[in-house]
């Protein structure tokens, strides 16, 4: 399933990409409201990192909205950790 955006945003984490040559750039971790999958009883929860990386909208799925949300939070945390390693620890 391809998503154009996270939809209704339920949480935002603001981070800064530190650059020694100038002011830091804002990076946002967005978490969308879980929704039921089309034609299915399971749910998905969209998330996106804006301001660094590829900025694509991703999602995690679960048997209900709670599990989808829980998995999305965990996956988003891992993706931020990987991105920070790629950026050599400049994400704060």
Where do the model's predicted regions map?
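N-terminal intrinsically disordered, cationic/polar leader segments
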Residues: 1-63, 78, 84-92
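A short, charged, amphipathic alpha-helix used as a generic interaction element across diverse proteins
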Residues: 69-77
């Amino acid at each position: 399933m391809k998503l154009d955006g996270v939809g209704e945003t339920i949480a935002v984490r603001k981070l800064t990409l530190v650059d020694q040559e100038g002011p830091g750039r804002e990076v946002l971790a967005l978490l969308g409201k879980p929704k039921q999958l089309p034609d299915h009883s399971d749910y998905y929860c969209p998330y996106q990192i804006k301001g660094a990386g590829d900025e694509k909208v991703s999602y995690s799925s679960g048997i209900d909205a709670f599990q989808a949300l829980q998995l999305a939070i965990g996956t988003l945390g891992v993706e931020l950790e990987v991105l920070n390693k790629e950026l050599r620890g400049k994400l704060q």
